[in-house]
Curated annotation (Swiss-Prot):
Pfam families: Peptidase_M13, Peptidase_M13_N. Glycans are attached at residues 69, 221, 240, 272, 307, 356, 412, 506, 684, 698. It is found in: Cell membrane. Its main location: membrane. Binds 1 zinc ion per subunit. Gene3D superfamilies: Collagenase (Catalytic Domain) (3.40.390.10), Neutral endopeptidase , domain2 (1.10.1380.10). Residues 85-769 form the Peptidase M13 domain. Residues 48-769 are extracellular. Probable cell surface protease. The keyword Hydrolase applies. This is Neprilysin-21. GO terms for molecular function: metal ion binding; metalloendopeptidase activity.
Amino acid sequence: MKPENGAATWHPAKRSCLGRLTTLETLLLVFLGLLITALLSVLFLWLWVLDGYKTFTDGRPIYPLPFENSSVAVDRSAKNHNDVVCTSRECVRLAGFLAENLNSKINPCEDFYEFACGNYGLNKNLPANKPLRHTISDVQSRLNKQVKSMLQSPISANEKPWDKVAKGYYQKCLDEEELESTGVEAMRDIAKRIGGWPTLEGDKWQEWSHSWEEQIALVLNLTGVNAVILEMAVTHDPSNSSRSVIELDQPKWGAGSRYPYLSGANDPMLRNYTTLMKMTAVALGADPAIAEKEMNEAMEFELKLVNFSADDMVRRDPERGNNRFELWQLKSVFPFINFEKYLKTVFKELVALSPNHTVIVREIDYFVGIQHVLQSTPKRVLANYISWRLVQGFSPFLPPSAREPFYQFKANQTGMFNSPPPDRWEDCVTLSVIMMDMPVGRLFVENFFEKERAMKKMTELTSYLKNEFIKQLHVLDWMDEITRRRAISKANMIEYKSGFPMVLFNDTWMEKNWGMIIKPREYLLHLTIRVKLVRFTEELLRLDQPLDRSMWFQSPAQVDAYYAPNNNEMIFPAGIMQFPFLTLGVPNYITYGMVGAVIGHEVSHAFDDQGGQYDEMGNLNDWWDAETEEKFIEKTRCFVRQYENVHVVEADIHLNGQLSLGENIADNGGVKTAFNAYKAWKSNTTGISEPALPGFQNFTSQQMFFLAYANNWCSLVRPKHYIQIILTDVHAPSKYRAMIPLQNRPEFAKAFQCPIGSPMNPERKCQVW
């Protein structure tokens, strides 16, 4: 109780106690109190740091945590990061990933790929049966093991039917003993169903009485095998993305690329391909002499077809392939191909085709050219070729001894002579992800995907990336205002889908689509065909129906990302949303540099030389001002020249700047947009420095962003495989996807203080977006 006059109350006992202390003891007691206060202050400061600098300014944290349960420590060497280093398990793991690849002896301004990825080859081996290895394939390998662990577990009675069918398919695929005893029989049975393989049957083969058009329609209806002589699809109408149309196109070729065919039958790859055809026929029971003669004839027939086909670079223009006909008009343009008979046989009673149904013919010259070839080719040759392509497509279902030549053919294409075949489980995982896409995807999401945190992070990333791309559109000096408004409208309307389709966890939908039962002793090949035909029937039934834009056309369990121009949407499956691309619990300079650049890449695809021809609704539409379009084309020519000037020493070949143009535009736009998005995120969070990664205390956040980006593309490639990539792949080899976009970025040169004219800071740079 306080006295009225405010004087302190006297306590004699306490005074007596203090009174007995000497002056020295009093000073020591005061010092002890100060020491305890100082220690408590240090402890409080330490807890403050561990809690992620949760100091508030204007109601917001100076350093907002990019993840939960962070762990950081003070490190005076981390001058660029306010003396703070991240010590969480995620940060340590990511730092180890970067450090393992880093070659710090290289000057980053001389060769940044070698700086960032130079030790990748020292710490990673290139398997004898692989043509290349890179960061993406490493993630795919880990995902394959994750899928394997789920599918190999025993099937229990109380499991969902779609889980049972996915596991049952995989486990049946693994049964090599069954394949050894039934694989040839199952394949011969399928060949018999489609009219027989003459090479196997010899003189006993009976020629079919119907036309070749009806024959390939029959093959499609009975097996789901499509791209033989021609390829048919029910797909988006290029001019009206809300509806579906029939599309007819040239097929894919048995040897892969069309390039070896251009050299004729004596091309080494085609000789290997013809040998494969003969060996397969003999493995299935053909007389070697008959196989020799008739597979040569089949090869010559395919060669004639390829001669009328279009080059991939020419096919890049979507407007060129938008050749629209009504069904009744096809006869006048292609008088010797009965497309009406073919299509009506394919659709049967599922959809009633009228003469006015729209048909898109992507390659008019191809179909005009092959008419006379097909007229003059004996049915026996046609039947041999069709049967061969059927068996080739189903080669994973052959016994091991009959599969071996297929592995060797592929290996020889990429310089892997006498390489061992992959383990069977790898093939079976791949087949399961393709054939059981949604059941396997659901299992993967349930077991290995952090849905809430990952989806939340992707929402943040896509929002920042989209906003930054739109900001870039606002300041382009070569784009007129009308085109700019349309471009901004398109960018705003891009739909971002990440993780998995919502129907994946709709049990009713899963039961309807994947409630099938594996029949006792059903051949693996027959089960596969049964699944293919269900999916193919669904495709046919989409004709004339409103398009369901919520559909996904690949499994969530895939390491991939893509932009679909006819839907104006981009999809990021759960498979790519994992370490190292999306590592939850690391600073954002890593996240934006890795998966952020992937998002930026896909955003840029909406405006590359192909995607830019589609409007905001996904319709093929000339929405560009003519002068602006010419300026755009001129800027893309800079990329073509830049990439084609690069000489790949390992294969003594230059990059193909035209074939890879769309991907190069996207790579360059992607890293720029991701870097600007990171800066925007940082600005919106008061700009405080994020913690360093352990071992990278001397790097700035900007340097770490570019280091993370380059680590997307660390790779090992066999020299011969470089040739195949450059001639046939729309992507540049990984090394150059890391290097060239950074050579074009002034922000990179500034971050590493690269002098103008140095290899990583050339005077002439290319940029579109």
